[in-house]
Structures are given as structure tokens and as C-alpha cells.
């Protein structure tokens, strides 16, 4: 459990409308459940059009986890277009494939993780800002991925990392320097993530 109350925990608006872009992942509705504690939610599949996304006129967008690689349109659908065309104006949170897509959409590279991880918790070191405001250092984050952000574009700061057994640092969070885009590689909605509700609440409190 979190040992610190996140900054802005009581500041979530009661009229928020959050749109999920579902990358066909079993975790999507766990995320929806978390967000539904604070906001009205709507889910569209990544096969939706950009017009569909814009027509919803959300206060925020969450890009779900999912299988595949962001270079493949069949895996991410409208996700990259959302990141490039909508997210500069609409606060956006990417999770797992959502992070990989954000990095890829802005010119970064995505490679293979040193080892595939599915359902293990790792300590997350972070900068204490944005979705990490008020959270303890080294909280346990549930990881489920075989890809990793290898080269993060200059438009982003690396906001969170974890280390492998040999000391290799892996990107676990990014934040755009100008646009309201944040993303995490771990899964806030996993039972393995000790502060998952706090991460979501911090994102919503920042709207």
C-alpha cells in the first residue's frame, strides 16, 4: 500500500469524461473500473476512427495496454493518430503498449526487453511529479511486457525507471515536455501495483 497521500488526491473534478482507446487487452476494463471511481468513462476499440475519438470530446484519454508492437497498425489502430493529433490538446495517459506507442509516435525506438516479464512486481523509481506525485520511492509495480522503450525522444523526460538484476536501467515512465502526455510501462490496474489507484487519481487530479 502507499505510505503517502498523493498530492491533489482530493482535487479530482466530479464532471470528468474519460475516453479509453482499447488495444484489445484483458486489462482494459480493470483500468476502466479504477477510473470509473472518479469519472464518466467511455471505451472505443482502436479500430475506431480519429473522428470518432474527437467526437466524444473527452476531458482526458487513456491508451490501454495490448499485444503487439506500435509499428504495426493492426496492433495499435488509431492510437498513434490520437497521440499526434489529439493528445497535444487533451491530457493523455498511456499504459504499457500506450507508453510504447507514445515513444514511437514521437520518433523513439521500441526494442525487446532483456527478458519478457508477465506478472512480476519490480520496484519503481520516479521523479515524484505528475502521476507519481506523493508516491513512495521504490513502490512495487506490476510488469507484463516483452517490449521496452530503447530510445526516448527529446520531447519526453524519463519519469520512472526500474533495474534488472545486472543493473540495466529500464524505462518505466515518460512525460512529454510540452504536451499533457504521460505514460507508464507498468500496469497501475494490476493487483501487483501497490499504488495503482493513486497513480490513476493523480492523473485525474491534474486535469
Curated annotation (Swiss-Prot):
Biological processes per GO annotation: L-tryptophan biosynthetic process
Record-listed L-glutamine binding positions: 66-68, 146-147
Gene3D superfamilies named in the record: 3.40.50.880
Subunit structure as annotated in this protein's UniProt entry: Tetramer of two components I and two components II.
GO-annotated cellular components: cytosol
Source species taxonomy: Archaea, Methanobacteriati, Methanobacteriota, Stenosarchaea group, Halobacteria
Domain (Glutamine amidotransferase type-1): residue spans on this chain: 17-207
SUPFAM superfamilies: Class I glutamine amidotransferase-like
Gene name, Swiss-Prot/TrEMBL: trpG1
Name of this chain's protein: Anthranilate synthase component II
Transmembrane intervals: none
Organism: Haloarcula marismortui (strain ATCC 43049 / DSM 3752 / JCM 8966 / VKM B-1809) (Halobacterium marismortui)
Pathway listed: Amino-acid biosynthesis; L-tryptophan biosynthesis; L-tryptophan from chorismate: step 1/5
Entry EC no(s): 4.1.3.27
Catalytic activity: chorismate + L-glutamine = anthranilate + pyruvate + L-glutamate + H(+)
GO molecular function, one term: anthranilate synthase activity
Note in the entry: Component I catalyzes the formation of anthranilate using ammonia rather than glutamine, whereas component II provides glutamine amidotransferase activity.
Keywords per UniProt: Amino-acid biosynthesis, Aromatic amino acid biosynthesis, Glutamine amidotransferase, Lyase, Tryptophan biosynthesis
